[in-house]
Amino acid sequence: MPVTDSIADYITRIRNAGRAKNKTTDIPYSKLRENISELLVAKGYIKSFTVITTEQFPFIRIDLKYSALGEPAIREITRVSKPGRRVYQGKDIRKYLGGLGLYILSSSKGIITDKEAREQGVGGEILFRIY
């Protein structure tokens, strides 16, 4: 069955895997999902990811990150901009949770965080927030 909102599907798979305490989760491949995964690795929310190509279809295998006590590194991950209600923000992006969390944006500079957007003076579509 085709997925209408691929980013919401990506977020849901990560959230469900974290709650189930799975070490890895597989997500269908897209360039956007790969770029988001690179950003989440750089910011320390996931351990690593690997793009795996098979004869049927490529997918991304994400290695989730947990604390020493077994708590997921991602406490909250929520979609902001949805297909029915797109949310755009100018260059004056506010901090999420006073800087403890991040907004992930799709901008003219690519997939970036709210902090990077403020530094570069660009805005964009707020894809999701993560804490």
From Swiss-Prot:
Domain of life: Bacteria
Record key words, sorted: Ribonucleoprotein, Ribosomal protein, RNA-binding, rRNA-binding
Pfam families on file: Ribosomal_S8 (PF00410)
Any Gene Ontology biological process: translation
Single GO molecular function: structural constituent of ribosome
Key word Membrane present: no
InterPro entries, sorted: Ribosomal_uS8 (IPR000630), Ribosomal_uS8_CS (IPR047863), Ribosomal_uS8_sf (IPR035987)
The UniProt record lists the keyword Transport: no
GO cellular component term of the entry, any: ribosome
Function: One of the primary rRNA binding proteins, it binds directly to 16S rRNA central domain where it helps coordinate assembly of the platform of the 30S subunit.
Assembly: Part of the 30S ribosomal subunit. Contacts proteins S5 and S12.
Similarity comment: Belongs to the universal ribosomal protein uS8 family.
Protein name (Swiss-Prot/TrEMBL): Small ribosomal subunit protein uS8
Organism from which the protein derives: Chlorobium limicola (strain DSM 245 / NBRC 103803 / 6330)
